[in-house]
Each structure stands twice: as C-alpha cells, then as structure tokens.
Amino acid sequence: MRVPYKWLQQYVDVTLPPAELADKLTMAGLAVEGVEDLTPGFQKVVAGKIKTITPHPDADHLVICNVDAGRELQLVTGAPNVHEGQMVAVALEGARLPGGREIHRATFRGVVSEGMLCSAQELGLDVSLVSPEDREGIITLPPDASPGADAAEVLGLKDVVLVLELTPNRADCLSILGVAREVAAITGAPIHLPATLPGEDGPEITGLATVEITAPDLCARYVARLVQGVRIGPSPAWLQAFLRAAGMRPINNVVDITNFIMLEMGQPLHAFDYDLLEGHRIIVRRAGPGEKITTLDGVERELDPEMLVIADAARPVAVAGVMGGLATEVTPATTNILIESAHFDGASIRRTSRRLGLRSEASTRFERGVNLEGAPAAADRAARLMAELAGGRVAPGRIDCYVKRRQPVTIELRPERVNYLLGTELAPTTMKELLERLHLEVRGEGPFQVTVPAYRGDLTGEIDLVEEIARLYGYNRIPVTLPGNLTAREKQAPAQRWEEAGREAAAAAGLAEVITYSFIGPRALDQLRLPEDHPWRRTVKIQNPLREEQSIMRPSLLPGLLEVAGRNASRRVLPVAIYELGRVFIPAGSRRPGEPLRLAGLVMGTTPRGWNWPAGEMDFYYLKGILESIFSRLRVRDVSWEASNAYPFLHPGRAATIKAGTRVLGYLGELHPDVLAAVELPARACAFELDWEAAGDLALRVPRYEPLPRFPAVERDLAVVVPATTPAAAVAGVIREAGGELLRAIALFDVYEGAPVPEGCKSLAYSLVYQLPDRTLTDAEVNAAQERIQRALEERLGASLRQ
C-alpha cells in the first residue's frame, strides 16, 4: 500500500518527518517497507500552455509552438501529440534533466527554440503512469495547471510516499483513511473525515434505475447512485498527482474519482455508462453456463456459474469485484453515470480472479475484506466529486439493497487478563483510553464491553483487543517478564502429548522433520505402482484444485517424503533421514472423511563414518533399528515384524508388516526399484509408515516400576535347528510362551547355516534367563522349563536341538 504523505495530511494533522512517522507505524504493527522520496531529478521545468502551432518553414517533421510558460516562449518540437490549448512541461533555458542533461537555447533549421517540450521519459517519470498517447510524445499536464507553475508541483513529485507491507488481516489499512486512523491513534492528532453528502437535483433515482440481487450469499449489499450531465475530461492536477503518487495512472475525471475513493476509503467502486444499461437495470447474479463477457482490457472471457456478475436486462456488464465490461465503459461520449458501491464475498472474488487470471486493486480489497457499512458513504462521496469535477447533477436518493446485514460485534475485555498476558500493570482507564483512540466504543468499568466498528473485521476476540492495547501502548514499553503460565504442557490433551512425544522420539533417533502438502496428484499414486483396486486409490478429491498435481488429499505420507527425498538428492544433499507426523485423508462415503494420524519416515544413503566406526548403508535393518528405538523410548509394547509382500511399492523380500498381536500398525521396507526410478532417486531407500494413534493405544504412558531382583538368575543357552524359512521371531515366541513366568529374558545371539547343519535348515542360538522375584530357582525347575521349551519347538515348528 502506497501512502502519499501530502494526501495523508489531508485527513490527520501530522507534522512528524516521514521517516519518524514510518518508525512509529512500524513499532505499532504496520510495517513500513520503505520511505520513497518523489523529488524529481530535474530543475527549471515549468507548466506551459500552447497558444499557437505553426509549421516549420524548412522541416516537415518539426513545428513551432508559441507557449505561455509564465512568459511567452518560442519552442521547436517534433512531438506528434501537440495541439493548441495543451498544457505541457517546458524545460527552460538552463534547466537540468535527469542524467545531467542541460537545456540551452538552440536553432533548428534557422528557427530559434528557447527551451524544450519534455516527454515523460526525459523527466525520468514512470511511463506506466502516463496515458498511452503521451508515451510516444510529450507529457500532457492537467488543464487546470497555471502557466509558469513548477512542473514538479503540478505532477505531485514534491512528496514522500510511505510504502506499507500490510498483513492480510489489516484490510482497513488498504485505504488512506485507514492509515490516517492509525496515525491519529498513535500520535494523538485529530482526524478529519472528508465531506461525503452531495447536493441533489432532479427526479429520484428510484424512478430511473432498479437493482436486484439474486445471489445474496455472494453479494451482501449493493448501493447505486446516479449522476447526470457529466462532462468527461482530464482530472484536475491535485487528483492526478495523488493518483500517480499512489501508483495509479490517471484516465479521466470519472474513472479517476472511482479510483481515488477506492484508495481514500478502501471501497472499490465502478462507474457504468447509465445510457448503455439495458432497461436501466442492475441484476447481481451468478453467471450462466458458457456465458461470455468482453472485459475492459478487450479480452473476451468465458464465465461459469460459480462466478458473480453484474448484469443489465440483457447481458453481463461486469465481473463483480474484478473488472468491468467493455459494453458499458465510460467514454468521452458518456453523459450519465451509474455508480456502483457494493460488498461482494471475498472467497468468491478470489476464486473468480484466479480462474480468469485477473487481479486488480479492487479484487485485492474484496479478497481481504471490505467495510460492509462503508458502501453508502463511498457512493455519496463519488457523486459529490463527480458533481464538482465533472459538472454533473446528482439524482436525489440512492438505491441501497442491503440483503445480508452485519451483526454488531461486542467483545468482553477483562483488564486483569490484559495485564496477565502482557506482564504489565496498566490501569483500566489507560486501557480504555487506548482503545477509544481506535474509535472503539468501550462501556463499563471492567470487564469492558467493547463494540468494534465495521471496518475492523480483524477484531473478533478478547486476544485481539489485548494486541491492540499492546501495540498502542508500545511493545518497547512492555517489561520483560517470565510467562505467567509455565504448566501449559501439563494442560495438553493426551492426544497432543502423544503427538509431541512422537516428534521428540523421531528426532532423538536421528530423523529430521519435514512438513509436506496435504494434497497431491494422481501421478504420485501411479509412481507407487498401486493397482487400480488398491485402497489408496480411493481418495478425497478437491473441488477447486490449484492444479492437477494438487487435486486429491493424500491417503499416505509416503508421496510427500519421496518428493522431499528427490529434491534433496537432486541437490546432492545426502544422506536423507526424514520423518513426518501428519494426517492422511480416508473417504467415508457421505460423511466427513477420516483423518487418522500417521508417522512416516524415509532414509537413503550411507551413515557418516567416524574415527571408531565405518560408514554403513541406511538399509532395512538400519531403519528397523530406528523404529525399535522409537518404540522403546515411548514404551510401545509387544511389537512384532512379519515378512510381507502385500505392499506393491516395497521390494519383495525386503518388506515387513509391523504388528502388535493381530493388530496391524504399519509397514517397513525397502522401496521397489521401479518406484525409485519413477521418482528419480539415485540410491536404495527404505521407508516406514505407522498408524500413530494405534501405536499410542499400546504405549505404556506411565512407566511401571519393578523392584530390583533380590534372587539370582539362571542363564542357559539353547541352539535349535529349524527350516531356513522359519522366522527367528516365531521361534522366540514359542520359547517365550513355553518358558512361562520363569523365563525373564530371551536374546538371539547366533545364526548359522552350513555344515554340519542340514541343507535347507539353519541354526538359531538363544540366551535364556530364568528368574523369580520371590525365591531362588532350583536346577530341577530350570531343567523342566528347558524340556518344555524343547518339546514345544519340536511339536510346533519341527525344531531339533543342535548337536
């Protein structure tokens, strides 16, 4: 938002230097990105009026202009756009132009030129802010400029502009008046609101035009004013100067007035040629299927029923809140103007603007939020200025279709809560005075009842008022204190604590957190080699996707991890060891989609080598170890790993289902080579994904204390021969079950294949620890347990003791 300093001073008595005011605004939460001095790089350039033009006697491409520049001057020019009565910029003898060029009296084919007529480029001006006609020739100054006046003053260049970087919630400051309110609140200076009510003459507008709203969900209010008998022409110098300083190009007096009021009050306006409106009707409706409109930029655009249009009795005449139509454009022949001042739904305007590829100052304001109560005043002010600057007559009354009224917003504010949150000791009277500076109505002595004006749509709760008090009081004046609430973690819900514990455990295991988009494209599922009937193919589709690659909600965290891994690998950032804890989306018919919480991770590359350990590949067992450390840290019990070929995106033979009893928690495995090729990963990679809420159900949230053993343990080794396809975990399960309460611990310490073990078999050796907490075990009890284990292994797994 560009705020010309002189324009700002029209509404608030501010005398601070611009740089100092910029600092105060920034400290109050309105960040000033820059202070731009418009002082021009030229001297001795004045306004002049061309009195006569005569051909050059000896050059067909030159003319001789007799110019009143405070004194009579003869100037020779080759500009194609000069005409008698035109106000121009005249560089006098001795003038200096940008780049150091100095102007002297010169003779052109025997005719003396006592100066030079200047173009926008020669004056160092932004050519986008001058008319297309003036870009190829000399610049035309406003017709009310005085001959001999400083051209820099006429062009509004002796000014300073504050460039504000506004946060999305401060839509009220997308106007000079909004910034003026802030300046008044910060400095205590009085604010002066502009006059709005026009003089009226002639028949009532209600007998000359009608307005109908058929889409009240997209248009809450529509105000119309009628101005008759206008004369289209250039705007006065002051208006053109303000518009240029604010970054807008002057066009004509009527259009300039609508732009001026949009910048002044924050309310976008549109001016229709009243005589070109069929039936003199305004209908605010959705577009019809395939309906088309040619907008002011000359482009024919196809509309759809999701878009809001302004129509007359026959056709759409504007895309609501985005751009007007060419059919009812204000032209030099226009004499009667219908002014539109409306409130359109911001989300609808945003969608329409994006689909049509059209963004404008108006659409930006509607997207951020426009003051619902400000439409009548803006229409009145526009009518008043058109009467003053375009010679029009304002029809009495206005049409105001207000179909969706704003409900007053009143917020309760507790002074003690303010001081608690800020760490201050402000008196309630001080808080009240600070809020009243912002034109908030404050009732009561505490708690206060604070009524919010319509233009402050960002104030919705008590915490917003606390912020307003803090920024006006001064962040730099708030004392440094410890937070008043040091037990926030204890007040977290169990689900929140479990989620945070997952992040801490994954980070402690050496994984870096990533956060990826919740929406992906169908191609991401194709890359995972998923068959058409795979559950992940049933996705939640986005109705209005930004693009095809973001058209469905993710059924898994794996696509996002693959994208991050690919981006890192393409930049040679290896190894990759990442995780994400987030929600996936599962369709549930007509009900709201399910959003289960998942923990997923991916590793790729080799571990860094150290002085006492070699580099190693991040393979299946490396990632399994990470998961085991996470489970151990969070006391997730009874986890088992079962070889599986059920996952088409994992390498057959290097994949496992993670289970707890019969409950499936997730998967772990090396990615299939075809998947690696599809996502262009240069090395083997392994991934896992867990149902994190299910894992939480198994976790021992409160550690269980067990007394240290007082009686000695008995250790025995057991080596058995089993078929080579028998999982070691299955053997351990049988041993644990048969050992009963005597068996305290079991650990696999040797795996062997080869002679003398029979072919097709393997030897597994386990260390068994027997112990009871209340007495010493006898050899007979331990021997009996060993025999039970051997019989169970033989009966259930066909195992035999290794000789």
Curated annotation (Swiss-Prot):
It catalyses: tRNA(Phe) + L-phenylalanine + ATP = L-phenylalanyl-tRNA(Phe) + AMP + diphosphate + H(+). One of its GO terms (molecular function) is tRNA binding. It comes from the Bacteria. It holds the Pfam family B3_4. Binds 2 magnesium ions per tetramer. GO terms for cellular component: phenylalanine-tRNA ligase complex. SMART domains: B3_4, B5, FDX-ACB. It is found in: Cytoplasm. GO terms for biological process: phenylalanyl-tRNA aminoacylation. Its cofactor is Mg(2+). The keyword Isomerase does not apply. Residues 39-152 form the tRNA-binding domain. Transmembrane segments: none annotated. Residues 709-802 form the FDX-ACB domain. Tetramer of two alpha and two beta subunits. PANTHER family: PHENYLALANINE--TRNA LIGASE BETA SUBUNIT (PTHR10947:SF0), PHENYLALANYL-TRNA SYNTHETASE BETA CHAIN AND LEUCINE-RICH REPEAT-CONTAINING PROTEIN 47 (PTHR10947). This is Phenylalanine--tRNA ligase beta subunit. It comes from Moorella thermoacetica (strain ATCC 39073 / JCM 9320). The gene is pheT.
